[in-house]
Swiss-Prot record:
Keywords tagged on the record: ATP-binding, Kinase, Nucleotide biosynthesis, Nucleotide-binding, Transferase
Organism per entry: Agrobacterium fabrum (strain C58 / ATCC 33970) (Agrobacterium tumefaciens (strain C58))
GO MF assignments: ATP binding; dTMP kinase activity
EC number: 2.7.4.9
Binding residues annotated for ATP, in chain numbering: G13, G14, E15, G16, A17, G18, K19, S20
Keyword Kinase included in the entry's annotation: yes
UniProt KW Transferase keyword: yes
Protein task: Phosphorylation of dTMP to form dTDP in both de novo and salvage pathways of dTTP synthesis.
Name this protein carries in UniProt: Thymidylate kinase
Cellular component terms (Gene Ontology): cytosol
Native organism taxonomy: Bacteria, Pseudomonadati, Pseudomonadota, Alphaproteobacteria, Hyphomicrobiales
UniProt record similarity statement: Belongs to the thymidylate kinase family.
Gene that specifies this protein: tmk
PROSITE patterns reported in the protein's UniProt record: THYMIDYLATE_KINASE
Cited HAMAP family: Thymidylate_kinase (MF_00165)
GO biological process, one term: dUDP biosynthetic process
Length: 224
């Protein structure tokens, strides 16, 4: 029997970049082609991690400081990996995750001013070898992304505390994501998020398509 191995794709980017919309679109397309797909998110994705998500995004953890917040993120990520992501990959499924390790590097590292070595040590413990085969970084000017996020809030969505931060902070995060893509070109692809939604979808699929043959083989193995 062939070894079962799924496909892990993470979606990264600043506020209002359109990640969640593209995850839903991609998941629907892949399921239509017969793939088993798990859609998940961070912080959260598992019962334990969702409890931590509420603490972090509500702002309740801010009083503990950015270092403790990074530890909370890592704890949530480890639970998510062990309870959801690793089992799904072992079943030969495709995992689409809205944010993963790069968000910690950017949000707690770059704009949280935590030492890179501290962040990387936490990540090694949290992910325990589970790294996305592909990371799609959705790039859009911070001002445009925040305008989208505000429109979403006007339509009833609850803004999280990150959306309320200064524009300069969001621009630093954009630059940090682009730096990650430059440093890890084999894993990361930049998606121009400042274009019509259907064109963004085309670009996403152009990056995902080369990986689907392997995922298809994994799905076949999972049913042997």
């Amino acid at each position: 029997m062939a070894e079962k191995t799924g496909l892990f794709i993470s979606f990264e980017g600043g506020e209002g970049a359109g990640k969640s919309t593209q995850i839903r679109t991609l998941a629907e397309a892949l399921r239509g082609r017969g793939f088993e797909v798990v859609v998940t998110r961070e912080p959260g994705g598992s019962p334990g991690a969702e409890a931590v998500r509420h603490v972090i995004l509500s702002g309740a953890a801010e009083s503990f400081g950015v270092r403790m917040e990074a530890i909370l993120f890592a704890a949530a990520r480890n639970d998510h990996v062990e309870e959801v992501i690793r089992p799904a990959l072992a079943r030969g499924e495709i995992v689409l995750c809205d944010r993963f390790l790069d968000s910690s590097r950017v949000y707690q590292g770059t704009t949280g001013n935590l030492e890179p070595d501290f962040i990387e040590t936490l990540q090694r413990i949290a992910i325990d070898g589970v790294v996305p085969e592909l990371t799609l970084i959705f790039d859009i000017a911070a001002e445009k992304g925040l305008a989208r996020a505000r429109k979403r809030a006007d339509e009833g969505a609850t803004p999280d505390r990150f959306e309320k931060e200064e524009i300069e902070t969001h621009e630093k995060r954009r630059e940090a994501y682009l730096d990650i893509a430059l440093a890890e070109p084999r894993r990361c692809r930049i998606v121009n998020a400042d274009q019509p939604e259907d064109k963004v979808t085309e670009d996403v699929m152009s990056f995902v398509e080369p990986l689907l043959e392997r995922a298809g083989n994994a799905a076949d193995a999972a049913h042997e």
